[in-house]
C-alpha cells in the first residue's frame, strides 16, 4: 500500500522510486503552532483524485471477487506529518496538541473513505501500523478511538473496514477490537492462534504469512508448508481468513504467490 497519499494531500514532500513504495521526506509540522494552523485539505489535492478514479475503474471492471480500497490510519498519518519519534513524545508532553492533530487527520480520512465508498468498492483496508508502537491503553486513546469514529461514519453492510496493524505483537489487540471494524488484519510478528481469541466471532481475523521470509525470499515448497501449518492451527476458527502479514515486497516471485493460493485450495479439499 502507498501510505504517503494522504500525507501528500496535507502538503508533505514525497520521494518516488522505481524500487520501493513512495516515502515521506522530512516532516511538514514542527510544533503545536504548526498543528493549529494545519488545514484539512480537500479531496482534490495530490494523488487523491487518481486513487479515487482507480478505485472506481476497479470496482466497475473486477466483478468476480471483492475489491477493497486502501487508506492510512489516523495515528500513522499524524506520524508522517509530525515525525513518528516526535509524535511519540508529543502524546505525553502535549496530549492536547496530539489530539488536535489526530482530529484533523481523522476528518480527512473520513472524507476520503466516504468518497471511496461512493466508487463502489466493497470496503477499505485501513493501515495503522504505527499504533503497534503504543501500549493497549495508548493505542485506544490515540488511535482506536479515532478509528472508531471513522468506522461509525462509513462502515455498512456493503462497505467494510478492515483494520491492519502489523506492529501489533498481540499487546494491543483489545484496542483494535474496540474500533468495531468488520475485520482485523495482523502481521507476522504475532501468533494468530492467540490473537484470534480476542476477536469477536462476528468479525474476521486475517493474516499472517511472513511477506519477506516466505513470500519474497522463500520457495513454493516453504510457502506450502507454512500455509498448511497456519491453517492447521486456525482450523477451529471459521472467522479466520488466510492472508499475507503485510504488503508483499517488490520482486516477490509470482511462483510463491501462486503457491500460496494453491496451498489454500489443496488444504480446503482435504
What are these regions (language model features)?
Residues 2-44, 57, 64-65:
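A contiguous, low-structure linker/loop signature
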Residues 21-24, 42-270:
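Active-site loop segments of alpha/beta catalytic cores
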Amino acid at each position: 500500500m502507498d501510505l504517503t497519499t494522504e500525507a501528500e494531500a496535507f502538503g508533505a514532500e514525497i520521494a518516488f522510486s522505481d524500487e520501493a513504495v513512495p516515502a515521506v521526506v522530512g516532516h511538514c509540522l514542527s510544533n503545536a503552532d504548526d498543528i493549529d494552523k494545519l488545514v484539512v485539505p480537500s479531496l482534490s489535492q495530490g494523488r487523491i483524485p487518481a486513487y479515487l478514479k482507480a478505485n472506481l475503474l476497479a470496482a466497475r471492471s473486477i466483478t468476480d471477487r471483492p475489491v477493497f480500497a486502501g487508506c492510512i490510519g489516523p495515528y500513522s498519518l499524524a506520524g508522517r506529518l509530525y515525525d513518528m519519534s516526535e509524535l511519540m513524545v508529543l502524546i505525553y508532553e502535549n496530549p492536547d496538541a496530539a489530539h488536535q492533530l489526530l482530529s484533523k487527520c481523522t476528518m480527512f480520512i473520513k472524507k476520503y473513505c466516504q468518497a471511496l465508498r461512493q466508487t463502489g468498492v466493497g470496503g477499505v483496508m485501513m493501515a495503522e501500523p504505527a499504533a503497534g508502537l503504543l501500549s493497549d491503553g495508548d493505542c485506544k486513546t490515540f488511535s482506536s478511538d479515532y478509528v472508531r469514529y471513522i468506522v461509525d461514519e462509513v462502515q455498512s453492510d456493503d462497505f467494510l473496514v478492515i483494520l491492519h496493524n502489523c506492529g501489533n505483537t498481540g499487546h494491543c489487540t483489545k484496542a483494535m477490537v474496540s474500533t468495531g471494524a468488520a475485520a482485523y488484519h495482523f502481521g507476522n510478528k504475532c501468533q494468530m492462534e492467540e490473537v484470534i481469541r480476542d476477536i469477536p466471532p462476528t468479525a474476521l481475523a486475517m493474516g499472517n504469512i511472513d511477506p519477506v521470509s516466505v513470500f519474497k525470499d522463500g520457495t513454493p515448497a516453504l510457502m506450502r508448508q507454512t500455509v498448511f501449518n497456519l491453517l492447521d492451527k486456525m482450523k477451529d476458527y471459521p472467522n479466520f481468513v488466510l492472508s499475507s502479514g503485510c504488503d508483499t515486497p517488490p520482486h516477490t516471485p509470482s511462483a510463491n504467490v501462486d503457491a500460496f493460493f494453491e496451498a489454500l485450495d489443496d488444504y480446503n479439499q482435504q
